[in-house]
Amino acid sequence: MTGMITDRSATTIIAQMLYLDAEDPAAPMTLRIDSPGGVATSTLAIYDAIQHVKAPVCTAVAGVAGGTAILIAVAGASGHRTATARSLYRFVRFRFRYRSEAAGRECDRLVDAFAAAIGRHTQLDRRAVARAMDREERMHALVALRRGFVDHVGGGDLLDGGR
């Protein structure tokens, strides 16, 4: 997964995951991440697919997991979330353009959904994640390891293997 997460890239990633899961639900699949994030709803669709497939999904960050891509990075199977030593996890404040109160509530719901999901997969609670998003915090791989965002940090060899 490289570049912005869009509706199109999410559809492609989800289709590949469902195909691999149908082929062999016991074989792990690896999702390599170097993305600044992107469309919130598309990211949530990928997250839902990761939670749905029976095959373990290993996540490997090489470069940046920014914005919404952080959720994909932390959603990998426990013990199988890796990052290269120079990887960066970069929170961003969600920016929405809305004109109605209902749209504003939906935006707040999306931010809360991201914060809660990231909190479930890390050592941070929902409020701490929301604060990190609001402050646009950055974490290098070793800090991400200490905070429970990743299970292993190392060199490029962490990116080998998987389907």
Features from the language model and the residues they span:
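Terminal-region recognition feature
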Residues: 1-163
